[in-house]
Amino acid sequence: RIWGFVLALFLLGPGLLVNAVLKAYWGRARPTAVTEFGGEANFTPFYQISDQCAKNCSFVSGEGSGSMTLAISALVILEFFRDRLSPATYRAGQGLTLLMLLFVGFQRVAAGGHFLSDVLLAWTFTALIAAVLAKPLLLRDSPPPAPVA
């Protein structure tokens, strides 16, 4: 089930939603391509579909979505092996996962490849897809929550 979740998340997040739909049709130019940073394209806010980019556009960040997918996958796998790990190893795994996620996002913005909103929304969309996939793929055999008294 875990590997099905990981595969589905990679296919639906970075694969389908980000690269096949948003980056292909949103048309938002990358920071290095807009006039404010020496390029020739006009800046457009993240919520506006544009014609300022023809292919491999800025919205949303593929690396941001991929790094969030990797982070969620790592956390799910860590949770699966939690009873076999020491508490320190488990926390270290969580911390390293968070550092990787933040590093990738910061690197994409610092390099001029994406606006901060591109990265934050890629993380958000990917997390939402993971939340939708979790119930049928990860939580289906979980016991129901205890009633609140």
Task: Show where each model-derived region lies.
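Membrane-interface interhelical connector segments
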Residues: 27-53
